[in-house]
Swiss-Prot record:
Compartments, as annotated in UniProt: Mitochondrion matrix
Primary localization: mitochondrion
Heme among keywords: no
Name recorded for this polypeptide: Probable pyruvate dehydrogenase protein X component, mitochondrial
Modified residues (N6-lipoyllysine): K76
Compositionally biased tracts (Basic and acidic residues): 136-157
Lipoyl-binding domain boundaries: 35-110
Pfam families: Biotin_lipoyl
Any one GO MF annotation of this record: dihydrolipoyllysine-residue acetyltransferase activity
Region (Disordered) residue spans: 123-161
Amino acid sequence: MLKHYIHQCVKASSCKHSLSVKQRYFHCSALNGVASMFRMPALSPTMEEGNITKWHFKEGDSFKSGDILLEVETDKATMDVEVQDNGILAKVLIEKGSNIPVGKNIAIVADAEDNLKDLELPKDEASSEEQSFSSSKEEVKPIVQDRETKSNVEHKSTSQANDAVNKSFLPSVSYLIHQYKIENPWSIPATGPHGRLLKGDVLAHVGKIDKGVPSSLQKFVRNLEVLDFSGVEPKKPSYTEDSVPVRKSTMIETLKTVPMKDEYITFERSISLEKLKSLLAKRKEKDAFGIDEVVSAMIGDALSISELSKVEPNSIESAYDLLLGAPIVKLKSSVSNFQPKLFPKNNNTKDLHKYIRDSMIGLPSNLSDYVKLNFSSVTKSSSNNVEFLDDVYDMLLGSNSDSIDSRINRHEEPSTTEDLTLTLSIKDNISKSRAIKFVDCLKSNFENPEFVLSRW
């Protein structure tokens, strides 16, 4: 029996009576057949009254927990009122558009399982504030001064033009209504937007200001609602149509005359191939490396020592990655990754200078956009001019030397030595110090090939 009694008490306490129930009961069975009052909720700590703008349910509609029952407008915002339990909206006591104090009965709600036909509706008892307001019948007679009849006529005609009257009051208007105890504030002519009653309308009604002031302000505001652009003319352009092609052609000519900035920085070194010729001749007898393998090995060794393949990252991108905390990717170098390739155009030629000069050098993929490596041949001629000057000097001193005729008549062909000129072009991403180290190392490799091939 005790267990059954506790179960019934819990069931009774869980019934739908949490929405502003005026009186609570404690029974051993569920309370059915009795509806409860739904009062105006306080949506903020400082809220004293509010306006009902919309009911989302009609009388007799059932609602569930979490549904929006109505919308309440306060002096700060318009907020939705949600229900906590399931139920039925039995009756709406106050429709929308009325200024209602907090705690006043606005509707009657019933349990979701109740039958509205057999339901006993509670009587709407007036609150203490309403009773005190209705009991005081003393009215403060406003001090009305004589005004011009013209302003009164304009004020009445303006109020008649407002077809859609907004019955919700602003806090300042509600304060004046309670201060001067105006019983029927809707009879006051409203000059606000959409028929809203303003503070000036109430002050004009009680005689604090001229009755024609609200109507004159209303006309002034309505004149500013629609902007008149009839007297506005578009601004004329500062240039004519004939001058536009001239400006375009002048700009094109200026672009043509401005020289393009060279993006590459060039380094040159002169290379002698005498030792390389003799080395290749010995290697050919032993059936060892060919020209392609030897030149590729020397270029790869210079790349590895100078670390030219380490492309510097973009300063802006690296700074952005540093701000985001992302790791900065650095390219690593190794001999296997940077082994270049030599692609000759003519494999049958026996001229070493021409063979290397006309060959294409395939650099690694990460250097192809930043580095250009070329070889060009330069012919140097050496004659006997120095030796001839020495002979003239001997003749002037009277030293023992060959006769002048024998010196002049002796004719020797000038000797020619052909060297290679190494040209390296780099962009800003490549370090200049590494580029200088590369060309110097490559020059040393060509002029001392035995030292390089001993490590390969």
